[in-house]
């Protein structure tokens, strides 16, 4: 049995994560609203949630997690490199949570241990 690696995290998301989030958010939102959401994310306080809860709220099926290639992120975890916190957006009540940036990190963390507490910003 492979030993579980401890996941290390940066204190704040990296600057490039916000750009990636804005690019992704332009798919479900108009560009102007995507920019507004990213500005909100930049101002948001850090939060912490269990990996399994984030994935459940995002309605991500396990088969989808297994389909992605997140070996790069798993290698970073194994090497002890700190990961950037993820960026989350709550759409309308009842809609699935949007992982605006950090989906592959989320998959790698969940695969390592679904109970891991994940730092994130959420709006």
Label every model-predicted segment.
Residues 1-66:
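An acidic, glycine-rich, mixed-charge low-complexity segment common to nucleic-acid enzymes
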Residues 2-11, 83-123:
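A short, basic-hydrophobic beta/loop patch
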Residues 42-98, 110-111:
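Short alpha-helix boundary/capping and kink motifs at helix termini
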């Amino acid at each position: 049995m492979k030993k579980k690696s401890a996941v290390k995290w940066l204190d704040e998301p990296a600057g490039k994560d916000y750009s990636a989030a804005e690019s992704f958010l332009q798919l479900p939102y108009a560009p102007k609203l995507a920019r507004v959401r990213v500005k909100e994310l930049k101002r948001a306080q850090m939060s912490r949630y269990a990996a399994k809860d984030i994935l459940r709220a995002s309605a991500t099926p396990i088969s989808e997690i297994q389909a992605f290639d997140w070996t790069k992120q798993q290698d970073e975890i194994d090497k002890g490199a700190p990961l950037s916190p993820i960026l989350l957006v709550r759409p309308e009540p009842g809609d699935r949570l949007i992982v605006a940036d950090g989906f592959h990190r989320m998959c790698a963390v969940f695969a390592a241990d679904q109970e891991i507490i994940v730092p994130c910003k959420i709006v």
